[in-house]
Amino acid sequence: CGTIHYSGKAVAPDDLTLLPPPDFTRLADNGYFNPVPVMPVYGCRGCKWRRCRFCAHNSSFGRYRSRPPAAVAQEMLERRVRFGCRHFYVVDQYVDPVYLDALSDAILALGLDCRFQVMARTVGEYTPALLYKAARAGCCWISWGMESGSQRMLDRMNKGTRVDTSLEVIRSAADEGISNLLMMIFGAPGSDAAALEETFTFLDRAWDSIDGMTASAFVLFDQTDFSRHTDRYGLEILGGNRILDLEGKPVHDMKLRFRRESEDGHGESPLAAGEIDAWERRKVWLPELPFHGRLCCEHYLLYADAMQARTRPGKRLRSA
């Protein structure tokens, strides 16, 4: 206990179906602080988009690999039967529209009574019909990697999304009773007062369709496009982020200490702090978001389920 064993570089299997399912036997019996079980499940490893210039997951999770959606739905059904679990936290970094469509079909085909969430990008392929189907299958919460309301900043981050399309997608999800959590980044390289105001304008327009939002300060991670091309983005790396000492040797995570060319920063730029402060002053004039926007993941899922029950999809007749 307390010993770390290192046996060499980890090998990422190509065929995820060869991996055994996780064993939750010892956790499932009174091992949760939640009122009901919430279990993780995954369909893919790595990110199918894998182009965001700020994201460490492009390297940390390796290349994109996926499991058959039918196998994921079957695993969820087995946990429903064995552990009485109907709430599932999908840990995939990005569930693209094609995979969400197939997973929803598989869940509906099994007649599985479940609730789950996914993380996604606000692209137009998340059509109203797909979101309707996903809600019928049990999707009650989507975390959207929106990052910014400025098209210039989205292009600079290489998100592959459009501001106007994003607004349509978020509103369509809300129409189906799906809880929208927006993940925003403040202080990214290239941001300025105009970009910040564009973000505020977007949030004003989308606010009535949002249940929760994270306002994250930009973090420079190793092995990202931003860190590999600091001269291009006006950044200077000051060093790694030391988290602990192991047997007298420093251990660093992927976070890098940095400053912008025009700043005297001591490892973290004041730009992000200033933008977040401006946002905090701005949002007091907006209606308060539901409480579940400030809950941990498992509790957010339970709360989103309860909220969706009030607006269960099916109130409008439309083909899925």
PLM features: what roles do these ranges have?
Residues 57-115, 128-129, 133-136, 175-176, ...:
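Conserved Radical SAM active-site core
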Residues 37, 84, 140:
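Exposed loop/turn and edge beta-strand positions of beta-sandwich/beta-sheet ligand-binding modules
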Residues 293-320:
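C-terminal non-catalytic accessory extensions
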Residues 1-71:
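Acidic, low-complexity intrinsically disordered segments
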Residues 40, 44-47, 72-80, 166-174:
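Structured alpha-helical segments in the cores of large, soluble enzyme domains
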Residues 66, 108-301:
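A structural motif corresponding to the C-terminal lobe/cap of the Radical SAM core domain
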Residues 55, 86-90, 142, 211-213:
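Hydrophobic residues within beta-strands of alpha/beta enzymes
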Residues 11-12, 44-48, 54, 59-60, ...:
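Short, glycine-/Ser/Thr-/acidic-enriched flexible segments
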